[in-house]
Amino acid sequence: MATLVSPPNFCAKEDAEALRKSVKGWGTNEKAIISILGHRNAGQRKEIRAAYEQLYQEDLLKPLESELSGDFEKAVYRWTLDPADRDAVLANVAIKKSTDVYNVIIEISCIHSPEELLAVRRAYQLRYKHSVEEDLAAHTTGDIRKLLVALVTAYRYDGHEINAKLANSEADILHDAIKDKAFNHEEIIRILSTRSKTQLMATFNKYRDDQGISISKNLLEEGANDFQKALHTAIRCLNDPKKYFEKVLRNAIKRVGTDEDALTRVIVTRAERDLRDIKEVYYKKNSVPLEQAVAKDTSGDYKAFLLTLLGKED
Amino acid sequence: MATLVSPPNFCAKEDAEALRKSVKGWGTNEKAIISILGHRNAGQRKEIRAAYEQLYQEDLLKPLESELSGDFEKAVYRWTLDPADRDAVLANVAIKKSTDVYNVIIEISCIHSPEELLAVRRAYQLRYKHSVEEDLAAHTTGDIRKLLVALVTAYRYDGHEINAKLANSEADILHDAIKDKAFNHEEIIRILSTRSKTQLMATFNKYRDDQGISISKNLLEEGANDFQKALHTAIRCLNDPKKYFEKVLRNAIKRVGTDEDALTRVIVTRAERDLRDIKEVYYKKNSVPLEQAVAKDTSGDYKAFLLTLLGKED
């Protein structure tokens, strides 16, 4: 379930006019921007951008970028983008800066449905005139490259059939590789990057039943270099995205100084999807409501915007 | 240019009725089947199958399969399929039988446009409840697997921009790998499987200008194990599909006993696309018209059907 609160009825033209006043008037009216954009779903934001473009011959993103600043600007800008295009931007920034590249690429590859991942690949090409795998492969090396490129180019079967025999044999293959510390074993990459999510779930369950320990825990027990961490992230994203995002939020908030990039990423990308469920998991694990934790670690317009996306009533 | 001759006006229902008579009457009327299906394009065949299904509650493919036989049956059956579905069948047969797997997978991966390749991947999933990369990865190993999976999962940028600097540096990378006989070098696979076709063309041209020999010739000069052959095929398919298909036809016909599978594959898959151009290349290289060579090597209904697809007037 989503946290975003958006009105069933809205007028794109009125919103565009109100936003124009907010960015072009005497001083920027951040509150108005938050109260409009923070309450519009992807389809509505798209209509608002189109209306704004038609009225003022300018992309709404331009004044948002120039009039706002810092984490608030980044959050509003990313939120306003079309979701697939936003993921393309996130992927490109991660690849170019080589920061968080594993996490961002793995999230996009392993959490999205096959069709959603494809939409991101399309959006990436439209925006950057390259394929995402092309840029990713050119900016990474070795085993990590093999894993990430295989994951991002996957177009998994999306059906719900389970082949129990296969789950059995591939749970063994995974365990043998982990036992032998052959983490970069081609078979691990093959299985994680080609099997359907339903099939993988069955394989991971079989692994846990056979070994008495989950594959993700087993992986980390054996130490954790970058490649193992990436594998671990992929398995978590494939297996239980909500639990995974809870952990990302927890780490982002716990860190001295707060990891705003991760915080913004999770809230902006999940607000229209499953942020309500992630909030629940967060509360169970931390005994503190997510809103409260976010409010404590952030401030000003950035805080107000994140809390709005988190479903706070105005 | 295509060789297929199909009427602008046709009636799917009439065709379906005529085909019904041809397969269900006293003795099968192969000539009628050839004269109808051999003159209908993909859209028309689709309509005929739909009309047949509606009239007789049966897929037209069923009687075609049961009433026809041998190479003729295979050719008519594959021709009647929707093109993306046909490629899915070709890929699956190649993967399962491990025959011609390199050629078929590389053709589909490197000759199709990114969207066409995607359509084949979708058709494959619909038909087999697996992804093509999943089956391919499970049935191959080692370097060949790396290459084929990377090619079949590609969703290349389809634009026409060329980055000359990149072509320069990647021509060098390719040459260094070939010079060192490091054919399985990850960089070769990365470049071939991620760069756009336009960019690759520029890279191959730069290679030829720098080295005085084309990359495909250079590859074969260094000996030819299976992996090198697969690389060679991929480069030819990316670079000049018509020349590549001419060679496939030449080899299929020259072989003692004729390679009907390859012959059928090229004619059936290219008749609505560029078979006229391939015929021209064939004539230039062999001084014998392709129709004549095919007629000499085949017989009966199979021969009549292939010649019809090759554009022979009735």
Swiss-Prot record, chains A, B:
Keyword Nucleus on entry: no
Residues where Ca(2+) 3 binds: 298
Residue ranges of Annexin repeats: 10-81, 82-153, 165-236, 240-311
Chain positions recorded as Ca(2+) 1 binding sites: 25, 27, 67
SMART domains: ANX (SM00335)
InterPro entries for the chain: Annexin, Annexin_repeat, Annexin_repeat_CS, Annexin_sf, AnnexinD_plant
GO biological process: response to cold; response to heat; response to salt stress; response to water deprivation
GO cellular component, one term: plasma membrane
Binding site for Ca(2+) 2: 253, 255, 257, 297
Taxonomy, superkingdom: Eukaryota
UniProt keyword terms in alphabetical order: Annexin, Calcium, Calcium/phospholipid-binding, Metal-binding, Repeat
Summary of the tissues where the protein is detected: Predominantly in developing fruit.
GO molecular function: calcium ion binding; calcium-dependent phospholipid binding; phosphatidylserine binding
Pfam families membership: Annexin
Domain notes: A pair of annexin repeats may form one binding site for calcium and phospholipid.
Record family assignment: Belongs to the annexin (TC 1.A.31.1) family.
PANTHER family: ANNEXIN (PTHR10502:SF204)
Protein name (database record): Annexin-like protein RJ4
